[in-house]
């Protein structure tokens, strides 16, 4: 498929669909298993319902924060909780900027209003946050505090980057997204390459969502086991089942994978082979 045949919104939807359809990806919802409170159809509904916001992102017709809020708002009508918040945080600037270099410019040009809209979106999700953050999404005064400090959305991501790998992409030029897209190309085409790329990323980067929910030790244990799978020392499906049983869901890794698939698709990477 020629990427020129699809617009940016369609490519973003395709990237999200390919990520959730690939299996097995240890701990993630996919076509083979759900969690009791979040199912495959919740992810698919989110992908479909977010289309108007993704269209605006592709046209760069509104601010980053406003579009992220709209995407979350449109996709939050189901009961499955947060499905694509992290993915929207990455996809929106990538779409608005036409790629990684443009996205880097876009994030630096964000405004205080973008930050406020982002926090409004954050408040609609059930994303786990670390306690004690001075910019607590649950604090009703947080919007005024953002304005008092003059913090734009890039500043907010900089504030969070030390403990959130999605925020970190904003401040390091989407470096991990680039590395992961390159890895996807190296692994070849189609679904199996997505699974292999996911396992590679899981083995080299501690998932910050896992850290927030289960702690640093569990995140490092997951990395070690993912490496053992890659080295043929551990069975992939057994590892997947263990993660599901313990509700260890590498959700931030999945967000990076979505962004990387989007970048690769824009470059002509083939999913249907």
What does each of the following model-derived ranges do?
Residues 52-102:
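Long, hydrophobic/aromatic-enriched structural stretches that serve as scaffold segments
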Residues 1-62, 98-247, 264-273:
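Phosphate-rich cofactor/ligand-interacting catalytic cores and adjacent structured alpha/beta frameworks
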Residues 79-92, 246-262:
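Conserved phosphate/anionic-ligand binding catalytic regions in large, soluble enzymes, centered on
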